[in-house]
Each structure stands twice: as structure tokens, then as C-alpha cells.
């Protein structure tokens, strides 16, 4: 059996097994000497708060944002469809808290943008909607399939 030892003068406030040191932000880009940096800049994010970042509709009520991995928020959206569609596009650049459930192409792809916007407005308050779109190259048609289990 192991002998129990009491150490009254020792205080363990953060044991190594539990304590994880806070990491600084990762270095963005380290180039070998034989590469030459052609562009290196930092730009603030868009500050427009009265228009949806995906469909450009006026925000007449409380906007929805994309939640980031570290608990922050980015963007202003009129619906979950718009939020998830943009999140699908930027997920390789922005660390997201959760995987987007809906993925639509940007509105510039569609000939009848109003039809897509009407669908967004119709499903704005619905929960549990998921789906995506598929581009048919031969016929130049985009099939949108949004579903719900509820």
C-alpha cells in the first residue's frame, strides 16, 4: 500500500494535468527567404449593421450573427438561412462554433433573385431547416433543396 504523506506548506493551485496555458494567436504567415510577400495587410471587418450580409435586405428586427469558435460574433443576417449560407462560404477562413446546416450560393448566381429572397423570408422563423443547393452545369440550373424534420 502507498503511504500517505501530508505536506502542509505546499499549495497546488494549478496542477499541470489541469492547467493549460493560454496560447497567443498563431503566426499568420512564415515565409522562407526565397519567397517574397506581395500583399500583407490587416483590414477591419464590415461595419454595416442595417443590411443582411448575404441577401442585402434591410434588417428591421434583431439581426442574427455567426458564432465564432472563441465565443465572438461576426456578421449581421436577417435569417438562419443567410447566416448559414455565408458561414458555409467562410468556414475555411473563420473558426466557427458549429457547422452550418444550410448552404446556398451567393445571390449573384441566380437569375431570379426575388424567388430566393422570398424563400428566405418564408422560412425566416422556421427551426430545424437544413439543406443545400446543387449547380447543374449542363442545363445551367441551380436546384435548391431545403428540408425539415419538424
Swiss-Prot record:
GO MF annotation list: zinc ion binding
Cysteines paired by S-S bonds: none
Top-rank lineage group of the source organism: Viruses
Pfam families: Pox_TAA1, zf-FCS
Keyword set, alphabetical order: Activator, Transcription, Transcription regulation
Function: Acts with RNA polymerase to initiate transcription from late gene promoters.
Subunit structure: Interacts with itself. Interacts with the late transcription factors VLTF-1/OPG093.
Family designation: Belongs to the orthopoxvirus VLTF-2/OPG126 family.
Protein name according to UniProt: Viral late gene transcription factor 2
Organism: Variola virus (isolate Human/India/Ind3/1967) (VARV)
Lineage, top ranks: Viruses, Varidnaviria, Bamfordvirae, Nucleocytoviricota, Pokkesviricetes
Gene from which the chain derives: OPG126
